[in-house]
From Swiss-Prot:
This is UPF0301 protein RPC_0788. The lineage of its organism: Bacteria, Pseudomonadati, Pseudomonadota, Alphaproteobacteria, Hyphomicrobiales. InterPro entries: AlgH-like. Disulfide bonds: none annotated. Transmembrane segments: none annotated.
Length: 213
């Protein structure tokens, strides 16, 4: 991982091969293999938001932030007053806050269902899944006008050009199609085993051999 990598622009040919035959993985899940040397990404599941010749950007979807919940974050950002925490809609009260990765950890990225869209701010990634990184979506969620499904990630994971491909070739990651139910639903810490089960693998079966489904 390159913690200084900037998020690349999303290539409009999502999932397509480039001229050199490389396949871009935006809209897919990365599942860390046991040989992952970087402890920050051990047993991580990452949703790839952008992947092109410029590099890659993704959000870790199974790492709770722990130190703050969504209502507290809204107060810190002065979107609501402290007294208004008890008046939030249920989906705002229970919205998950995650450690999205080591890059720009002070910035929020909302992965959400496609029933919410802000012109020039929302990036459609795959069918039913979008990314918005402006405070407007937090305001919408706070007043009950946001997307039906959403998670907030602080920071993201970034790769320099060709770096993700090298890590996959080095047995660092499995990759498979994304699952909206896995991204938005269920216990956060169970997502690693759920992602493996999705491609027919028991966690104990993992070895040093990488591949994809």
């Amino acid at each position: 991982m390159d913690p200084k990598s900037k998020a690349p622009k999303r290539d409009e040919t999502k999932g397509a091969d480039d001229a050199s035959g490389r396949r871009y993985l935006d809209g897919q899940l990365l599942i860390a293999m046991p040989v992952m040397e970087d402890e920050r990404f051990a047993r991580s599941v990452i949703y790839v938001c952008a992947h092109s010749s410029e590099g890659a950007m993704g959000i870790i979807v199974n790492r709770p932030a722990g130190s703050i919940d969504f209502p507290e974050l809204l107060v810190q950002l002065e979107i609501i007053d402290k007294a208004d925490q008890i008046k939030l809609p249920e989906n705002a009260e229970t919205m998950k806050v995650l450690k999205g990765g080591p890059v720009e950890t002070g910035r929020g990225f909302v992965l959400h269902s496609s029933d919410f869209f802000i012109k020039d701010a929302t990036l459609p990634i795959d069918e039913g899944i979008c990314l918005t990184a402006t405070v407007d979506i937090l305001r919408a969620i706070a007043r009950g006008a946001g997307p039906k499904h959403a998670i907030l990630a602080l920071g993201y994971a970034g790769w320099a050009p060709g770096q993700l491909e090298t890590e996959i070739q080095g047995n660092g990651w499995l990759h498979c199609p994304a699952d909206a139910d896995l991204i938005f639903g269920g216990d956060i810490e169970a997502k690693y085993s759920r992602a493996l089960h999705k491609i027919g693998i028991e966690p104990g079966m993992l070895s040093n051999e990488a591949g994809h489904a």
